[in-house]
């Protein structure tokens, strides 16, 4: 059990640091587009979870520590629904209703499409 906990922890640290770095970089370059960082990591995370899920389906021998470290740890740290929700509320509170609705729709449907695309890539 300890190796599994360590794998998830290490993946979580790596994913969280990547999300933090992405947010800092986007906010430094496009401060008025704060929501872009969350959108980017969520879409990329959805693509990656599709790819990993597809790979793990055809490679059942991949150890649970690797699977959990990447999916639960890394992608769990990288992606975030709570930040998406806060970004949407901030846009609504600033009166940018159309942008908030577009952002929410793109996040949900873009995430679903990216997950499907990632899974499909593993079937080529």
UniProtKB/Swiss-Prot annotation:
Catalytic activity: fluoride(in) = fluoride(out)
Localisation: Cell inner membrane
GO biological process: cellular detoxification of fluoride
Domain of life the protein comes from: Bacteria
Gene Ontology CC terms, in alphabetical order: plasma membrane
Alphabetical UniProt keywords: Cell inner membrane, Cell membrane, Ion channel, Ion transport, Membrane, Metal-binding, Sodium, Transmembrane, Transmembrane helix, Transport
UniProt: Na(+) binding residues: 76, 79
Topological category with respect to the lipid bilayer: Multi-pass membrane protein
Activity regulation statement: Na(+) is not transported, but it plays an essential structural role and its presence is essential for fluoride channel function.
Membrane-spanning segments: 1-21, 38-58, 69-89, 97-117
Molecular function via GO: fluoride channel activity; metal ion binding
Principal subcellular localisation of the protein: membrane
Family to which the UniProt record says this protein belongs: Belongs to the fluoride channel Fluc/FEX (TC 1.A.43) family.
PANTHER family named in the record: FLUORIDE EXPORT PROTEIN 1-RELATED (PTHR28259:SF1)
NCBIfam families listed in its UniProt record: crcB (TIGR00494), PRK14234.1 (NF010830)
Biological function: Fluoride-specific ion channel. Important for reducing fluoride concentration in the cell, thus reducing its toxicity.
Name listed for the protein in its UniProt record: Fluoride-specific ion channel FluC
Organism: Pseudomonas fluorescens (strain ATCC BAA-477 / NRRL B-23932 / Pf-5)
Phylogenetic classification of the source organism: Bacteria, Pseudomonadati, Pseudomonadota, Gammaproteobacteria, Pseudomonadales
Gene name as annotated: fluC
């Amino acid at each position: 059990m300890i190796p599994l906990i360590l794998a998830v922890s290490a993946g979580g640290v790596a994913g969280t640091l990547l999300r933090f770095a992405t947010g800092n970089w986007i906010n430094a370059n496009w401060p008025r587009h704060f929501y872009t960082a969350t959108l980017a990591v969520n879409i990329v995370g959805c693509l990656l979870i599709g790819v990993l899920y597809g790979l793990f389906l055809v490679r059942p021998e991949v150890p649970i520590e690797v699977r959990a470290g990447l999916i639960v740890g890394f992608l769990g740290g990288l992606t975030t629904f709570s930040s998406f929700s806060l970004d949407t509320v901030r846009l609504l509170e600033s009166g940018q209703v159309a942008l908030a609705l577009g952002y929410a729709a793109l996040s949900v449907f873009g995430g679903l499409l990216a997950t499907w695309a990632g899974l499909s890539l593993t079937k080529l």
